[in-house]
Amino acid sequence: MDGTLFPGDDDLAIPATEFFSTKADKKPEAKREAIVKADEDDNEETLKQRLTNLEKKITNVTTKFEQIEKCCKRNDEVLFRLENHAETLRAAMISLAKKIDVQTGRRPYE
């Protein structure tokens, strides 16, 4: 044993591929798409395609944020109603306890 109790305890860098793999790693070399860099040589089609892809992703993110906002708003309303309901139940239980105390003679009628 070389003195390490846990993997990674020896301060050696663990490659990230041990924890996850990307879609590009799963594709064979022949089917992988080449990475396109934004240079002056790029034609308009490639730039338009990249912009539309970016636009789609941004639209998806904003849609998800809107859904999250609606969900949080709905949860806030439900929580408010539950808090009011709990307060109403507490008041009803107190009045019931007073009524029982009066009827059993533990407390004088007020």
UniProtKB/Swiss-Prot annotation:
Query: Keyword Disulfide bond on this protein?
Result: yes
Can you say where in the cell this protein is located? Virion
Keyword list (alphabetical) reads: Coiled coil, Disulfide bond, Phosphoprotein, Virion
Q: Which residues form the signal peptide?
A: none
Key word Protein biosynthesis present: no
Entries under InterPro entries matching the protein? Chordopox_Fusion/A27 (IPR003436)
The role this protein plays is: Structural protein involved in the envelopment of mature virion (MV) to form the wrapped virion (WV). The wrapping consists of the addition of Golgi membranes to the mature virion. Participates in mature virion (MV) movement within the infected cell. May play an indirect role in MV-cell fusion.
The protein's name is: Protein OPG154
